[in-house]
């Protein structure tokens, strides 16, 4: 195994444990839930294939689903986000960037990185909450949960980016 693969596995284990033990238990005001494992998917290098990204997304989702006793909704949402990530990232990159760059403030600048992250995270929550609520009569709850969870998760993304050594 290469050093990058070992680092990915280490990051996967640490984020999965943090998600399951801490963040899945926190529901601010009964609406907002942070899914910090999305940071891992956001920070995968651009050259990571779409299939690899989707496998990582599915693995994070299934670990969260098993720990939280949810029937596959995190898996579906994380896989949907992983599928669309490539296309969203392509909209914010230019030809001068190397193929193996890691999305972040250094490569995309603050504006590009924030929009990229918000769009990816919005796809995750726009898939997750309709599957969880499964009823249109809860539209207001769906909207509040989606917006508040995107905001809370973005807060963690920005804080992580501030403390990232690769800034």
Predicted regions and their residues:
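Terminal, non-globular segments
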Residues: 1-167
């Amino acid at each position: 195994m290469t050093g990058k693969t070992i680092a990915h596995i280490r990051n996967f284990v640490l984020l999965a444990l943090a998600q399951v033990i801490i963040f899945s238990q926190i529901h601010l005001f009964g609406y907002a839930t942070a899914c910090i494992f999305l940071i891992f998917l956001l920070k995968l290098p651009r050259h990571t294939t779409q299939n690899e990204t989707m496998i990582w997304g599915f693995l994070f989702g299934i670990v969260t689903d098993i720990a939280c006793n949810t029937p596959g909704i995190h898996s579906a949402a994380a896989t949907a986000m992983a599928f669309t990530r490539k296309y969203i990232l392509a909209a914010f990159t230019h030809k001068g960037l190397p193929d193996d760059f890691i999305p972040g403030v250094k490569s995309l600048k603050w504006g590009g990185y924030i929009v990229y992250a918000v769009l990816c995270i919005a796809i995750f929550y726009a898939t997750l909450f309709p599957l969880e609520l499964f009823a249109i009569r809860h539209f207001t709850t769906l909207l509040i949960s989606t917006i508040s969870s995107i905001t809370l998760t973005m807060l963690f993304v920005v804080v992580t980016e501030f403390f990232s050594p690769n800034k």
